[in-house]
């Protein structure tokens, strides 16, 4: 497994690391970002920060040289989802996601909405099973499959709809690469360097384990954002991944 770059011709970094920004204050988020190098990672903006600070936060990060994964997990009727995905592309994000459970028509509409953007379109991925969910959580929703089985079913639907890949747990990555092929991108949260606390994630792996499993992009949050020296932490993670590769 080697580092994979964005499909965009203007890729900033070849690191597979995506740092999750989870801040309540814009100034603190930007102060953290100013400590790290866009050559060492990409950045993920989720629902809370986007709701608080809007598209301008994404522009602020882009102006600092970072690729941005807009993690809003769109899940709505096909037309609404398509418009939202197109708006994300207009914003110039590197990656955007939808919920695979929204179904084939919704995912196909999202895919088609990106066609006018050509090579400048963001990667479009789908969320399968949230990494916080266990078998009992799925059973509560009437799903009798295990998280791995349900994730694979949704991943297959995602590929059939022509999306670029899925969000999945690292434990599913090995099989997904075998089943769906190397070109189908796997984005994995719940990645934590050895010695880090699990937090609210239930299915976790170290960066080295994730790379070996076939993960293309690994989302890492607090182990980097709460580090006393986040720039060095990122360099250490990337160095360990290069050794693993």
Curated annotation (Swiss-Prot):
Q: Which reaction does it catalyse?
A: orotidine 5'-phosphate + H(+) = UMP + CO2
Q: What are the UniProt keywords, alphabetically? A: Decarboxylase, Lyase, Pyrimidine biosynthesis
Q: What is its EC number?
A: 4.1.1.23
Which InterPro entries does this chain map to? Aldolase_TIM (IPR013785), OMPdecase (IPR014732), OMPdecase_AS (IPR018089), OMPdecase_bac (IPR047596), OMPdeCOase_dom (IPR001754), RibuloseP-bd_barrel (IPR011060)
One biological process term from GO is: 'de novo' pyrimidine nucleobase biosynthetic process
Q: Which superkingdom is the protein from? A: Bacteria
Q: What does UniProt list as catalytic?
A: 73
Q: Which positions are annotated as binding substrate?
A: 22, 44, 71-80, 131, 192, 201, 221-222
Q: Which GO terms describe its cellular component?
A: cytosol
Q: Does the keyword Oxidoreductase apply?
A: no
Which EC class is the enzyme in?
lyase
**What Pfam families does its record include?**
OMPdecase
**Sample GO molecular function, one term:** orotidine-5'-phosphate decarboxylase activity
**What pathway does the UniProt record associate with this protein?**
Pyrimidine metabolism; UMP biosynthesis via de novo pathway; UMP from orotate: step 2/2
Family to which the UniProt record says this protein belongs = Belongs to the OMP decarboxylase family. Type 1 subfamily.
This molecule's function is given as: Catalyzes the decarboxylation of orotidine 5'-monophosphate (OMP) to uridine 5'-monophosphate (UMP).
UniProt cross-references to NCBIfam families, sorted A to Z: PRK00230.1, pyrF
Q: How does it assemble?
A: Homodimer.
This chain's protein is named Orotidine 5'-phosphate decarboxylase
Please tell me the species this chain comes from. Salmonella newport (strain SL254)
State the organism's lineage. Bacteria, Pseudomonadati, Pseudomonadota, Gammaproteobacteria, Enterobacterales
Gene name per UniProt: pyrF
């Amino acid at each position: 497994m080697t580092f994979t770059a964005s499909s965009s011709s203007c890729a900033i970094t070849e690191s597979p690391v995506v740092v999750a920004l989870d801040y309540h204050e814009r100034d603190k988020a930007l102060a953290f970002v100013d400590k790290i190098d866009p050559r060492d990672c990409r950045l993920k903006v989720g629902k809370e920060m986007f709701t608080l600070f809007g598209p301008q936060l994404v522009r602020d990060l882009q102006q600092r040289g970072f690729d941005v994964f807009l993690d809003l997990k769109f899940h709505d009727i096909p037309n609404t989802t398509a418009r939202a995905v197109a708006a994300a592309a207009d914003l110039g994000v590197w990656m955007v996601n939808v919920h695979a459970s929204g179904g084939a028509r919704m995912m196909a509409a999202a895919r088609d909405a990106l066609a006018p953007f050509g090579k400048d379109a963001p990667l479009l991925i789908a969320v399968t099973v949230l990494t916080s969910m266990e078998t009992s959580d799925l059973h509560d929703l009437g799903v009798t499959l295990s998280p791995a089985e349900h994730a694979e079913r949704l991943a297959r639907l995602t590929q059939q709809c022509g999306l670029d890949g899925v969000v999945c747990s690292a434990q599913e990555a090995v099989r997904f690469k075998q089943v769906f092929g190397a070109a189908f991108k796997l984005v994995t949260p719940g990645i934590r360097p050895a010695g880090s606390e699990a937090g609210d994630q239930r299915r976790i792996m170290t960066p080295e384990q994730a790379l070996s499993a076939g993960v293309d992009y690994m989302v890492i949050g607090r182990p980097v954002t709460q580090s006393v020296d986040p720039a060095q932490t990122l360099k250490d993670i990337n160095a360990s991944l290069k050794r693993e590769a």
